[in-house]
């Protein structure tokens, strides 16, 4: 599982290891739990709400579905957030139709973010605002 928090970011920086340059989601702990491939994907917002639209891939494409578990601390202040995006091994950016919305006091929630990608695309990075999470360990499976 990949996690990012302010304390974790500071520990990595202090150890001299590469990490994201800033913490874009103060008070919100996010853990990538899996990356899957699918021919269809739900376009629900995060946390899941009433949007029940399902997308279907076109020939030569698939959905890379990234699941993220979120945990909001008392320091979390809801604000408009950008949509997550992913990068592949060539540095090409893929966006999702799903957005992160105000969790309305829900302290823990899990969301899936579908990304329409060409068949065989290997993802390297998940980006939420200016925070980056390495996905290469999920793609090695």
Question: Which residues does each PLM region occupy?
Answer:
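Compositionally biased, low-complexity segments enriched in small residues
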Residues: 1-2, 117
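Sec-dependent N-terminal signal peptides
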Residues: 2-14
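Conserved functional micro-motifs across diverse proteins
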Residues: 13-141
């Amino acid at each position: 599982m990949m996690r990012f928090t302010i304390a974790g970011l500071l520990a990595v920086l202090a150890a001299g290891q590469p990490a994201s340059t800033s913490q874009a989601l103060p008070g919100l702990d996010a853990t990538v739990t899996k990356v899957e491939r699918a021919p269809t994907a739900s376009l629900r917002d995060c946390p899941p709400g009433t949007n029940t639209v399902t997308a279907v891939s076109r020939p030569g494409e698939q959905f890379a579905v990234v699941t993220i578990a979120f945990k909001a601390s008392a320091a979390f202040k809801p604000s408009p957030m950008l949509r997550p995006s992913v990068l592949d091994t060539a540095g090409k950016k893929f966006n999702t139709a799903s957005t992160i919305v105000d969790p309305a006091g829900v302290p823990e929630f899990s969301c899936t973010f579908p990304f329409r990608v060409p068949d065989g695309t290997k993802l390297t990075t998940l980006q939420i605002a200016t925070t980056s999470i390495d996905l290469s360990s999920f793609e090695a499976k």
